[in-house]
Amino acid sequence: MPVTFALLLLLGQATADPCYDPQGRPQFCLPPVTQLAAVAASCPQACALSPGNHLGARETCNGSLTLALGGPFLLTSVSLRFCTPGPPALILSAAWASGGPWRLLWHRPAWPGALGGPERVTFHSTPGPKATVAASHLRVEFGGQAGLAAAGLRGRCQCHGHAARCAARARPPRCHCRHHTTGPGCESCRPSHRDWPWRPATPRHPHPCLPCSCNQHARRCRFNSELFRLSGGRSGGVCERCRHHTAGRHCHYCQPGFWRDPSQPIFSRRACRACQCHPIGATGGTCNQTSGQCTCKLGVTGLTCNRCGPGYQQSRSPRMPCQRIPEATTTLATTPGAYSSDPQCQNYCNMSDTRVHMSLRRYCQQDHVLRAQVLASEAAGPAWQRLAVRVLAVYKQRAQPVRRGDQDAWVPRADLTCGCLRLQPGTDYLLLGSAVGDPDPTRLILDRHGLALPWRPRWARPLKRLQQEERAGGCRGVRAPTPSPRPEH
């Protein structure tokens, strides 16, 4: 039993990690001191005798030795042995990289006296973990009469307090990094642990690298110093390459085209589900991030915009898949005679019949001249009605160009109530939009200042001729009529 206990104790000591305390918390650690370099040579005659000196006095000679360590190390001691007693003046210099700059470590003047100084000289850096002599090259300069017989260097790998083991003979030397650091000298954080800036460990604080909060959707992140400052020094990591259709600094919301499934936790691979919007009934492939509701076209309803709403029926148009069901005896606007007794409608409309003489002046005063077909209508607030129209031809453009195809037009509710515009679904109209007032540049507006006349094929040629005259400059100098107010929308 005592033998078994001793073996378990030794095994526990061998497997203990010096970079973590018994509770598993990070702590400052250093690799062991090892022999970095050793140089030995025979002792030749340091300096030749001067031929003119019968007393045999020696001349002063100088020498230097540069050692390349193969990587950065923390030097702990430098031992020098000379061929004869009385070593010369010594200068030790260290450089962090090849080519310098060199930093003076130790300077020893020549020993006075005939016998000289000691045969061996040893330089020690600050003992313990506070050793600060970091170098990859060491230079020894000496002058005088003695020659250098041997030199030895001892030190440890530069791991910045984040490793207790090191492959010192590797080139460059590689530390077995802990505290979620990486690099030959543990000089940076792992790609997934960059929520705090990298710092070297100290005996008072190990400064481990902390993981970024990516909800298990990213394997790497980057450190942002500005976010770290704004957070009061709490967090500065930004997740990169979010997976599983997530996005954001912490991969905490879904990409466009996906929505958050509340039945799954945020760190689940199935936290984001595809919107599955209908390709014809929806305006696009995106949906609400919370509910998954797609943005439907006019008259279309459903979570994925896959059916027509109440009062609408399916059509064959991919751009307007649902049309309002027409009523048997009514149109979109009521005839003027039905409301002729309303005092507000008296002299309100532009009372013109279908016999319109389109002169060049009147053509130029219009905001737009279009041939369009009315498809459907729905209320858009208390003062406006939105019409779905299909523009078939454009004879006069607005300041904001009108394109051919399906789009929306806006009509004041009062103009329809008083019968200023007579519109029937499925019928082609010549739409004359007056430039009176200040039309919304982003919307196609039809009101009482313009006309909506049932289209007649014989109008096409005269309108083409007026269009050519406008392009030739025929509308220059023609002013629009006096403005009048429109309802707010």
UniProtKB/Swiss-Prot annotation:
InterPro entries: Laminin/Netrin_ECM, LE_dom, LMN_ATRN_NET-like_EGF, Netrin_domain, Netrin_module_non-TIMP, TIMP-like_OB-fold. Residues 345-475 form the NTR domain. Residues 157-211, 212-274, 275-324 form the Laminin EGF-like domain. One of its GO terms (biological process) is neurogenesis. Disulfide bonds join 157-166, 159-175, 177-186, 189-209, 212-221, 214-239, 242-251, 254-272, 275-287, 277-294, 296-305, 308-322, 345-418, 349-420, 364-475. GO terms for cellular component: extracellular region. Residues 470-489 are annotated as: Disordered. Its main location: secreted. Glycans are attached at residue 62. It is found in: Secreted. Keywords: Developmental protein, Disulfide bond, Glycoprotein, Laminin EGF-like domain, Neurogenesis, Repeat, Secreted, Signal. Residues 1-16 form the signal peptide. Plays a role in neurogenesis. Prevents motor neuron cell body migration out of the neural tube. This is Netrin-5. It comes from Homo sapiens.
